[in-house]
Amino acid sequence: MCIRDRVKYLSVNDLGNRVWQIANQQASGDRDSTTLLSTVALGGDYARVRTHAKLVGQGGSTRQVALYFADGSQTHDFRTTQEHVAPKTTSDLLFKGAVNDVASSVYTGLIKIGPDARGTQAFQTNRNLTLSDGAWAKSVPNLEIDTNDVKCSHASTVGPIDEDQRFYLESRGIQPDVAERLVVLGFFDEVLEQLPVGSLAGELRELIGKKLHKAVIPGVLGVPA
């Protein structure tokens, strides 16, 4: 990328359940450039996505966002790098996923701050929902910092859906299975709002709803009755 460039990239995986995917996304940002690397991963048997955002010019910024949902025996594997070479650069990452049945997900992330990257800010967040006893998710955030005067943080969670949220919906007459779908969609909304999808947001919500119970209830998940 050149000075002050603005780039938005979106990858959507809705592959068949017998397909393997090995994907690699790379971006290098120059001075005052801005990049958005975004991923939606719903399909495939095994899907691995490696994303590397490198900031080589002062004032550059990058953001990585992803939404993933694995069911059946699917495996989703994400490996991300936020590399800061130049000073006063900024990166932010938000990955949110859900696993159901006996599916699995693995997230491995690295924030790498070089010796000349003073004044850098870098943040990394990975949240995972486990929707069944047989599903599992693993989150491995990492920091590698070679200079002072930086602000960096990482956070990760793995666990079931919030029972208080489900109870609240059920107390208002919503059926348990529908309440679970709404909680999961609400969990994903933070990512959906940041994706450069425009009018496709409704279609993505429909795909997620179908994966929850293989059918969407009209009028409930943003799908017309």
Question: Where are each of the predicted segments found?
Answer:
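Conserved beta-strand/loop scaffold segments within soluble protein domains that form the structured core
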Residues: R4-I174, F188, L195-L221, A225
